[in-house]
């Protein structure tokens, strides 16, 4: 089934960036579209459909150039879609695009745990695409994990991402099933109080944490 975004007859999605002087915080309309794209993404069954949603999120980000949350989501979806591309050049192009949006978000919202964590994820994905980057980017990823946790120790996504990474690390390096399970348990606990005034605030990961806990309990 093709995923889609429902709109009112009088509404149209943002088609192009507004003039620089008009690009302020999100309008009610752009925020509404962002929420619809986020909701629709999880119903998509194909990569083509997910990339269609990505283009919509990017249009919202371009129309709300001073809104860090819109920039964040554009970076996030570029990053996670990169994992679906086996071609190295295509994956790297998406990660480069993701990083540009995340850097924009960081320039708008200093020292935000969600943004720092997303940059760590992007760097981790770069290592996945190009393992030879591990020596260079590996320490950066660990430092970004630590910074994200220090900025907001209640952010469940920090513990989820760290926990999942520990699943693939040897025990002698601090990883393994036991260490990963401890982090995922903490993530699930933090998700219980993960509430924000802005409905577009990053909220992903709870289902993934639940899936990982099921796997770790086997």
Task: Report residues per predicted region.
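N-terminal leader/linker segments that initiate helical-solenoid repeat arrays
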Residues: 9-73
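Terminal, low-structured helical/coil segments at or just beyond the last alpha-helical repeat
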Residues: 13-17, 178-182, 186-218
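Short coil/turn linking the two alpha-helices of tandem helical-hairpin repeats
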Residues: 40-45, 80-89, 120, 125-134, ...
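Helix-turn-helix repeat elements of alpha-solenoid scaffolds
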Residues: 42-56, 90-100, 134-142, 181-186
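Canonical positions in the second alpha-helix
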Residues: 60, 105, 147-148, 187
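Structural register within alpha-helical repeat arrays
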Residues: 74, 81, 119, 126, ...
């Amino acid at each position: 089934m093709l995923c889609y975004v429902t709109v009112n007859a009088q509404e149209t999605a943002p088609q192009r960036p507004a003039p620089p002087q008009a690009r302020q915080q999100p309008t009610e309309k752009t925020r509404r579209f962002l929420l619809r794209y986020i909701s629709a993404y999880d119903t998509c069954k194909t990569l083509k459909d997910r990339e269609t949603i990505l283009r919509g999120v990017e249009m919202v980000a371009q129309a709300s150039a001073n809104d860090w949350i819109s920039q964040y989501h554009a970076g996030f979806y570029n990053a996670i879609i990169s994992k679906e591309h086996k071609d190295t050049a295509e994956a790297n192009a998406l990660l480069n695009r993701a990083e540009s949006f995340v850097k924009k978000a960081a320039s708008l919202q200093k020292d935000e745990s969600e943004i720092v964590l997303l940059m760590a994820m992007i760097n981790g994905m770069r290592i996945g695409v190009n393992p030879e980057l591990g020596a260079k980017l590996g320490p950066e990823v660990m430092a970004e994990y630590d910074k994200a946790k220090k900025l907001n120790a209640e952010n469940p996504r920090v513990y989820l991402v760290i926990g999942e990474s520990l699943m693939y690390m040897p025990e002698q390096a601090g990883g393994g099933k036991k260490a990963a399970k401890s982090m995922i348990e903490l993530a699930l606990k933090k998700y219980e109080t993960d509430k924000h005034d802005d409905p577009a605030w990053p909220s992903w990961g709870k289902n993934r944490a639940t899936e990982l806990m099921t796997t770790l309990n086997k």
